[in-house]
Amino acid sequence: MTNAAARDGRLLEIRDTSTPWTLRTYPTRAEWEARARFIREHILACTGLLPLPPKTPLKPRVFGRLEREGYAVEKVFFESLPGFFVCGNLYRPLNGARRTPAIACPHGHWARGRLEDSEMCSVPGRCINLARQGNVVFSWDMAGHRDSKQIGHRDFGGPREDLWGIGVLGLQLWNSIRVVDFL
């Protein structure tokens, strides 16, 4: 073993799901903010979003409002990139408040995406619950799911996309950033 390998902490202990993990603490706010900047930049670089693309107009369309007990739900689509659409549902409380907290609610890895409504999980149920608690909630399709079929969920990524330095993770992250802009 070389001296460099002997000092490599990854070679000293094999970690598994039973290994205790202590989160690093930061003695000052400035140290944490520096670390947060580093992490943010690292994520953007790894997803092909450094530098960030320009934020073009979203051109949102909100329509098809249905009112139910304590909430309303509307259909939404907007452009995260010129000609690329993010589709979803906007849940709003019916409490009449002018300003309410907003929640971006991704669907996770469920087979039916934002429309998953099973014993294990109900994405619409989660959104309805949050809206009835007074929050505006947006649940959107990941690329390749439900109404967002401009690209296939597993088909995006290859030599052409590599030339641009963006893959499906970068596209999903960019769509999520634009969801926050929409809210």
Task: Enumerate the language-model features and the residues they cover.
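Cap/lid segment of the alpha/beta-hydrolase catalytic domain
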Residues: 97-182
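A generic structural signal for ordered alpha-helices
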Residues: 10, 17, 21, 56, ...
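Acidic, low-complexity proline/glycine-rich segments
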Residues: 1-12
